[in-house]
Design a protein with these regions (language model features):
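Carbohydrate-binding/catalytic loop surfaces
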Residues: 1, 44-65, 105-124, 161-174
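Single conserved hydrophobic/aromatic residue that forms the stacking wall/gate
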Residues: 1-10
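Structural helix-adjacent loops and short alpha-helical linkers that scaffold large soluble proteins
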Residues: 15-29, 76-90, 133-146
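Well-ordered mid-protein domain cores that form the structural environment of catalytic cofactors
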Residues: 24, 29-78
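Long, well-ordered core segments of solenoidal/helical folds
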Residues: 27-44, 88-105, 145-163
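Internal, well-ordered domain-core segments that constitute the primary functional module
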Residues: 60-107, 114-118, 125
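Loop-centered beta-sheet repeat module
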Residues: 120-174
Length: 174
């Protein structure tokens, strides 16, 4: 099985931050091509796992695959100078927001009998927005970043425990 998007993020970040190694850039482009050809379902959501040949194995209820793909596309745009990948990352980010805001698209983690929420999506949105903002030089992503930080502070940060809690009740209660 292959988790392409996450692997690709590391290759691009290595190229952008460690060494301008053309082999890394070529590997990143190959991975992006694979992601685009094999990792999206017809509903616009991504598979979580596919085989090396691109056969889908598993699709999850959350948007982490989409998040890593958007980060990968942003990093590739920065590394290669090809802004079409920044636009693709932006489009994917907007699709992620639609998935999160539209009831029924993403299955809830818990049934209503266990009302709680986690910080994982909130935190990954900071990273995704930051990377796309860097790729397209668009300060409008500050709103998403600020909203995510505000939600972390309001609901998940608990100074009484000297901790940022991973899961809390619907209103941030422990």
């Amino acid at each position: 099985a292959l988790s392409s998007a996450a692997s690709d993020v590391y290759k691009r970040q290595a190229y952008n931050n460690i060494e301008k190694n053309e082999a890394w850039l070529a590997a990143a482009k190959s991975t992006i091509d694979f992601i685009e050809a094999h990792c999206f379902d017809s509903d616009g959501r991504m598979y979580f796992e596919v085989t090396a040949e691109g056969t889908p194995l598993r699709k999850r209820r959350y948007i982490f695959s989409e998040s890593f793909a958007a980060i990968a596309m942003s990093e590739y745009a920065i590394a290669s100078g090809d802004q079409t990948y920044a636009v693709k990352a932006l489009d994917l980010f907007k699709r992620m927001q639609y998935f999160m805001e539209t009831p029924g698209i993403l299955a809830p983690k818990y049934l209503d009998t266990l009302p709680m929420k986690g910080h994982s999506i909130t935190m990954i949105l900071i990273n995704v927005a930051s990377r796309i903002r860097q790729a397209i030089q668009d300060e409008s992503f500050n709103g998403q970043i600020d909203a995510s930080i505000d939600q972390l502070r309001k609901d998940f940060m608990h100074p009484e425990f000297k901790a940022l809690l991973e899961t809390v009740g619907p209103n941030g209660e422990f």
